[in-house]
C-alpha cells in the first residue's frame, strides 16, 4: 500500500467500526494530542480550601497574630515621660542581665529534670500493669487513674493546699497524731510539693497515651514469645518497651512544655503558703504576669515571653530530633 498507513478505529455517534484504514497523516490530525495545550482548561477544585478555610482563619487570629504582636511589642518600652517608644533590643539586653528571670528559669528547669521522669515512669508502670490484663477491676482502675486529669488545675491545687496545711490539713493531723513537725510548705521542699501536685494531675493522661500504644501491638507477638519460652519481663523488655518509643517522645515534649509553663499551682498556693516562700517571680510565667499586669511593663513581659518560647521550642526540637535518631537505628 502506497504511503504510510495505520489501522484506526472510526467512532461515529457512539458506534465503533474496527478494521478501517486511515492514512497516518489524517489519523494524527484527528488525534487529541494535536490540540494546543491552551485549549485544555483545568478546573480548580475549591472544596478542600472550603473545609480548611475555617481552621486557617482561627489559626491565624489565635496563634500567628498574637505571636507577631508580642514580637512587635518586645521592641518597645513604656516610659513615664514620652509614653511607648521604640527601644530596639533594649528589653532583650535587660533580660540577659535580669537575675530574677534566670533564677525562675533555673527553678523550672530543676522542676522539669526531676518531675517529668518520675511522672512518665509512673505512667509507664501503670500502662504496663493495665495492659497485662491481670488486674481485678481493670476498667475501674483505668478510670480512677485518669480522673485527676479531668479535675481543673485550680481545684486540684486547692485540694492539695488544704492537704498540705500543717495547722488545718492532713499534714497537720498527722503531726498532731505522731508528734512531728512536718511542714510541706517549707521553701526547701515546696518545689517538690508542687511537683507532686503536677504528677497527680497528669500521670493518668500520660498513662492513657502509653496504654494506647501498647494496645495496638499484635497479640501474635506475645504468643510467639511465649512459645519460645520468654518470661513476662522479657516480653516487656523486648516487645512492649520498644513500642513505647514514639509515644514516649510525645509525652516528653508535652511534659517539658507544660513544666516550663508552670503557673497555676504556685500562683494559687502563693496565698496559702506562710511567709514569702512563693515570690512573684517564682516561675517565668508568674514573672511575666507580674510585669504585665502589676508592674505596667507589658513590653518587657513580651520580650520575656518570646525568650521563654524560644527556649522551650529549642528543647522540644532537640528531644524530637533525638527521638527520630533513636527510632531510625
Task: Please identify what each model-predicted range represents.
Residues 1-52, 135-139, 320-329:
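Transmembrane alpha-helical segments of polytopic membrane transport and secretion proteins
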Residues 44-329:
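A structural signal for multi-pass alpha-helical bundles of membrane permease subunits
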Amino acid at each position: 500500500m502506497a504511503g504510510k498507513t495505520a489501522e484506526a478505529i472510526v467512532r461515529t455517534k457512539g458506534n465503533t467500526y474496527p478494521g478501517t484504514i486511515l492514512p497516518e497523516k489524517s489519523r494524527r490530525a484527528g488525534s487529541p494530542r494535536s490540540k494546543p495545550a491552551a485549549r485544555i482548561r483545568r478546573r480548580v477544585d475549591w472544596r478542600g480550601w472550603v473545609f480548611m478555610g475555617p481552621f486557617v482563619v482561627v489559626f491565624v487570629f489565635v496563634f500567628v497574630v498574637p505571636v507577631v504582636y508580642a514580637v512587635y511589642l518586645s521592641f518597645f518600652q513604656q516610659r513615664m515621660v514620652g509614653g511607648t517608644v521604640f527601644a530596639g533590643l533594649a528589653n532583650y539586653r535587660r533580660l540577659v542581665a535580669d537575675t530574677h528571670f534566670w533564677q525562675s528559669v533555673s527553678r523550672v528547669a530543676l522542676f522539669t529534670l526531676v518531675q517529668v521522669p518520675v511522672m512518665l515512669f509512673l505512667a509507664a508502670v501503670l500502662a504496663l500493669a493495665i495492659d497485662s490484663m491481670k488486674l481485678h477491676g481493670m476498667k475501674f482502675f483505668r478510670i480512677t487513674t485518669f480522673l485527676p486529669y479531668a479535675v481543673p488545675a485550680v481545684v486540684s491545687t486547692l485540694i492539695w493546699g488544704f492537704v498540705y496545711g500543717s495547722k488545718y490539713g492532713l499534714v497537720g493531723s498527722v503531726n498532731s497524731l505522731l508528734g512531728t513537725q512536718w511542714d510541706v510548705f517549707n521553701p526547701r521542699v515546696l518545689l517538690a510539693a508542687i511537683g507532686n501536685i503536677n504528677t497527680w494531675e497528669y500521670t493518668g493522661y500520660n498513662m492513657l497515651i502509653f496504654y494506647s500504644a501498647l494496645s495496638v501491638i499484635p497479640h501474635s507477638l506475645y504468643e510467639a514469645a511465649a512459645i519460645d519460652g520468654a518470661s513476662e519481663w522479657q516480653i516487656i523488655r523486648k516487645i512492649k518497651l520498644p513500642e513505647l518509643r514514639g509515644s514516649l517522645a510525645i509525652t516528653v515534649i508535652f511534659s517539658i512544655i507544660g513544666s516550663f509553663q508552670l503557673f497555676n499551682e504556685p500562683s494559687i498556693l502563693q496565698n496559702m503558703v506562710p511567709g514569702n516562700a512563693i515570690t512573684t517571680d517564682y516561675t517565668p510565667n508568674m514573672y511575666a504576669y507580674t510585669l504585665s499586669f502589676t508592674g505596667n511593663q507589658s513590653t518587657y513581659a513580651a520580650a520575656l515571653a518570646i525568650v521563654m518560647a524560644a527556649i522551650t521550642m529549642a528543647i522540644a526540637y532537640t528531644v524530637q530530633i533525638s527521638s527520630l535518631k533513636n527510632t531510625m537505628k
